[in-house]
From Swiss-Prot:
GO terms for molecular function: actin binding; troponin T binding. The modification Phosphoserine is found at S118. Residues 29-53 are annotated as: Disordered. Keywords: Acetylation, Actin-binding, Muscle protein, Phosphoprotein. It comes from Rattus norvegicus. This is Troponin I, fast skeletal muscle. It comes from the Eukaryota.
């Protein structure tokens, strides 16, 4: 067991030593990478950004500001032109895709949701905002009076329940019921 413990300790010590060496190598690589990035950044800035020369007089500073503003305006115009081109090309792509689907006969159907919409809103959506159409669907409906059913009339006519019982009691009350039914 003594040899085995020494061996395990040697293995763990060797592992720790290898880990520390690997960490040192990684740290030096990171430092080299950082210095390389910094030098690339300096090279890029020196190539693309001319050194700033600030003149001494006020008129020269104003002239420099005007030049810088002109450059900014030109860059903004280019940016706007590029955005317009991108929008135009994306629109053309969408149109071409739609034509492609039409030619193939396969339509890409978007998922539709059920929307509650009044008739006026539907007409406005179909015809556009230029046409003002008010459609009252209830105006053309026929008005119907509710006819009283016999049961409702009986209930209204009954009034006091005692009178109802007296009328229906005996043979004459039964006779009246049969006469009214036929």
């Amino acid at each position: 067991m003594g040899d085995e413990e020494k061996r395990n300790r040697a293995i763990t010590a060797r592992r720790q030593h290898l880990k520390s060496v690997m960490l040192q190598i990684a740290a030096t690589e990171l430092e080299k990478e950082e210095s390389r990035r910094e030098s690339e950044k300096q090279n890029y800035l020196s190539e693309h950004c001319p050194p700033l020369h600030i003149p001494g007089s006020m008129s020269e500073v104003q002239e420099l500001c005007k030049q810088l503003h002109a450059k900014i305006d030109a860059a903004e115009e280019e940016k706007y032109d590029m955005e317009v081109k991108v929008q135009k090309s994306s629109k053309e792509l969408e149109d071409m895709n739609q034509k492609l689907f039409d030619l193939r006969g396969k339509f890409k159907r978007p998922p539709l949701r059920r929307v509650r919409m009044s008739a006026d809103a539907m007409l406005k959506a179909l015809l556009g905002s230029k046409h003002k159409v008010c459609m009252d669907l209830r105006a053309n409906l026929k008005q119907v009076k509710k006819e009283d059913t016999e049961k409702e009339r009986d209930l209204r006519d009954v009034g006091d329940w005692r009178k109802n019982i007296e009328e229906k009691s005996g043979m004459e009350g039964r006779k009246k019921m049969f006469e009214s039914e036929s």
